[in-house]
Amino acid sequence: MPKEDCKYWDKCYQQNPAHLSKYNHPKKQQEHEVDGAEGKKVAPKRSASSQSGEQKKEEQTEPVNKDKSNTSASSTEMVNKDTAKGSYEAETEELHKEAMSNISGKNYMEILEKRIRLSVQKEYDNLCESNEFIRHKFLVEMPPDFYEFWKFVGSLKIDPAKPKDAGLEHLDKVFQLQLVGPFEFLAGKFHGAKLGEPGDYLRHWRFYYDPPEFQTIFVRRGTGIHYGYWRDVPQDKENLLIARNDSAKGCQFQFVAGNAFDAFLYYLEHDFAATPFSCGQLAGTKKAVAKYLSDNSLELAQLDRLQRERNKRVVAKTFHRAGIVVPFDQKTEVGYRPLAVSDSELKKMLAMLERKDVDNGAAKQAVLEKLQPVANAANIAVDESDFGSALELGIDMFCSGHKELHMLASSLLVPAYSMLSRPQFIAIAKAHMEQRSREDNLSIFDVLK
């Protein structure tokens, strides 16, 4: 009986007699046969006609050339990238070394702070190029009559050497009248000036009793007499009343004009003491005002009309007598309620702080204890949408002039102005109470020397 072929062929590892007697272990011939068959299949392709072969050769050569071209371009690109990368790395390394050499031996934070200052200075310089400076630094915008009055001042005195501030110097020299605040910006005094903190600009020419609603524009040199625009809402920039105060005499304000021109004439009539030498210039200046208004056909808002309209909206006079204006619903009586005590009772409480026979600490404690229920009632009023009550008491605390009450005043003014959507007044009030001064010279330029 013939033996079967082992499935492992000559690769079988079994050597036992039983397996060898049963199976043959020949070499695997099929592999060679398959190889031969494959060789026969390939051979006809290699023996094709010469024309076909040349065509195929051309077809095969073209992709090869393209591949070579692509390979060459790719290689060039890689070389360029490597070169650029090397150049970039070298440049980066060079810059790094330069930066490290500059920083070496120096305080890194000082360098960083210097860069920040340069950035802030650049922003400030850009801001000085437009009237946006006024809104940004003083948090308010000026009415049209303000800019018209500035043009008039420029016509009073023309000096090519000082085109912007010749008029200001003329009014100061002849009438002892300083045009300050936003007028100084128009005169170019803030350009190139030393930078201050935000609060410094809000305190610029802000006298001791000036509430946030008031902004100084005129000052009688060397005195506490000053005039300014009154805004019940920070965004107000049309038909603003102008008020007057003498900080040496107290906190009361008086509305004197409905525009800057009339305020100037009021000053010339009431706060300027003319001499025989200045009478001629006084008369000439008054005529110049009338001529300018006539030539430019300016119709300016008048005091009587503006004050009459405002009085309808005043809910409480307060200590400064100018009154406060808040939204008030006549039907529901929501928006304001009277304080828990009258003005006279409130003044009696505060009078204890002025007594010299009572220890200041004890007086302060006693006054605060009496004021606390009044303040609590005002805060409850705020919770019930009567925001005017907290505003009234806060203004009264501020106008009392006692710095011991600043914290109480702030605790009333902040929520009141916040609920009335007057955040600019919060910033102004806080900045003022931080450094409140009885000085007459309150210019930022002297503060930053």
From Swiss-Prot:
Active-site residue numbers: E384 (proton donor)
Modified residues (Phosphoserine): S72
Pfam families hit by this protein: HPF1, zf-CCHH
One Gene Ontology cellular component annotation held by this UniProt entry: nucleus
Ranges annotated as CCHC-type zinc finger: 3-28
Subcellular location field: Chromosome; Nucleus
Segments of this protein annotated with the region Disordered: 18-93
Compositionally biased residues, Basic and acidic residues: 28-41, 54-69
One MF annotation (Gene Ontology) recorded for this entry: zinc ion binding
PANTHER family from the UniProt entry: HISTONE PARYLATION FACTOR 1
Family indicated by similarity: Belongs to the HPF1 family.
Role, per record: Cofactor for serine ADP-ribosylation that confers serine specificity on Parp. Switches the amino acid specificity of Parp from aspartate or glutamate to serine residues. Acts by completing the active site of Parp: forms a composite active site composed of residues from HPF1/CG1218 and Parp.
Protein name: Histone PARylation factor 1-like
